[in-house]
């Protein structure tokens, strides 16, 4: 289902969604999103997706510890990316942590936030 974007309507401001991951290209995506936000007078939403791990589900305590560690790592990655955006453009991005399939979580965040008007993904320029 497609939701009408409201980012440029009165009372709304455009937002750019940037996916924060562990790739070297992520810094370029954060850079672009921060500069875009300044240029259009918008905001940035930073998303970190924790992929659900089906292993150790029968060991509930182990799964809980692994989940807590994944959330700590996600917060640390968002701290770094938010700090970079703030240093580049003096903005404070919104931070979102989701669990599950990355593609589905990206689509879900876009669907639920009608102010998101751009998705920034960084890509390698190499042969990988």
What do these predicted ranges mean?
Residues 14, 116-117:
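Conserved acidic residues
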Residues 92-95:
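Rossmann-fold cofactor-recognition segment
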Residues 5-60:
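Small/aliphatic-rich secondary-structure junction motif
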Residues 63-76:
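A short acidic, glycine-rich active-site loop
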Residues 109-116:
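Glycine-rich phosphate-binding loop signature in dinucleotide/nucleotide-binding domains
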Residues 118-128:
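Glycine-rich, Arg-bearing micro-motifs that act as flexible, cationic patches
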Residues 97-105:
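Charged docking surfaces used in two-component/phosphorelay signaling
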Residues 32, 108-109:
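A short acidic, amphipathic alpha-helical/loop segment
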């Amino acid at each position: 289902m497609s939701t009408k974007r409201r980012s440029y309507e009165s009372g709304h401001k455009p937002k750019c969604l940037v996916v924060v991951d562990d790739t070297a290209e992520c810094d370029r995506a954060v850079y672009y999103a921060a500069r875009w936000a300044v240029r259009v007078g918008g905001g940035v939403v930073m998303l970190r997706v924790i992929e659900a791990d089906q292993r150790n589900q029968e060991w509930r305590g182990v799964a809980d510890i692994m989940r807590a560690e994944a959330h700590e790592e996600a917060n640390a990655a968002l701290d770094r990316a938010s700090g970079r955006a703030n240093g580049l453009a003096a903005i404070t991005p919104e931070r979102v942590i989701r669990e599950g399939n990355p593609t589905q979580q990206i689509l879900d965040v876009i669907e639920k936030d009608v102010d998101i008007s751009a998705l920034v993904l960084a890509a390698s320029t190499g042969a990988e």
